From Swiss-Prot:
The modification N6-lipoyllysine is found at K97. One of its GO terms (biological process) is glycine decarboxylation via glycine cleavage system. Residues 1-34 form a transit peptide. Belongs to the GcvH family. The glycine cleavage system is composed of four proteins: P, T, L and H. This is Glycine cleavage system H protein, mitochondrial. Keywords: Lipoyl, Mitochondrion, Transit peptide. GO terms for cellular component: glycine cleavage complex; mitochondrial matrix. It comes from Pisum sativum. Its cofactor is (R)-lipoate. It is found in: Mitochondrion.
Length: 165
């Protein structure tokens, strides 16, 4: 009740009315990528991320990608032992909006897959950089990491890509 009275008095003070007949459709552009982009990771223009630690690289799709896909309902992953090639598909993500191939940002051999995604594919939405990782590989060409984007470059890439659409 107190909150309702405060809201009413504030609306009166600001001359706000819920019965306003003026309907405006504001036009504005958002010049900032609102997705999480983490420092310390490398990013591919196809919206996959890589976390390289020692002889292992963990790969998943970015927060930006999962946001555009919507609710993820199914994930297809390769088997351990399979080789992946930079720029080539290694799996797929199916959402309520679309099915998208997932490309490997670097080449290597799959040493582990996130089996938790089988029962909970939504982990890609809720935790794309932690619980929603997809595969771990042993890179065959670690120098391929140098061609990927850092956090600032990826943020700029997303902003430009979103502005173009």
């Amino acid at each position: 009740m107190a909150l309702r009275m405060w809201a009413s008095s504030t609306a009166n003070a600001l001359k706000l009315s819920s019965s306003s007949r003026l309907h405006l459709s504001p036009t504005f552009s958002i010049s900032r990528c609102f997705s999480n982009v983490l420092d310390g990771l490398k990013y591919a223009p196809s919206h996959e991320w890589v976390k390289h630690e020692g002889s292992v690289a963990t790969i998943g799709i970015t927060d930006h990608a999962q946001d555009h896909l919507g609710e993820v309902v199914f994930v297809e992953l390769p088997e351990p032992g399979v080789s992946v090639t930079k720029g080539k598909g290694f799996g797929a993500v199916e959402s309520v909006k679309a099915t998208s191939d997932v490309n490997s940002p670097i080449s290597g051999e799959v040493i582990e897959v996130n089996t938790g995604l089988t029962g909970k594919p939504g982990l890609i939405n809720s935790s794309p950089y932690e619980d929603g990782w997809m595969i771990k590989i042993k890179p065959t060409s670690p120098d391929e990491l140098e061609s990927l984007l850092g956090a600032k470059e990826y943020t700029k890439f997303c902003e430009e890509e979103d502005a173009a659409h």
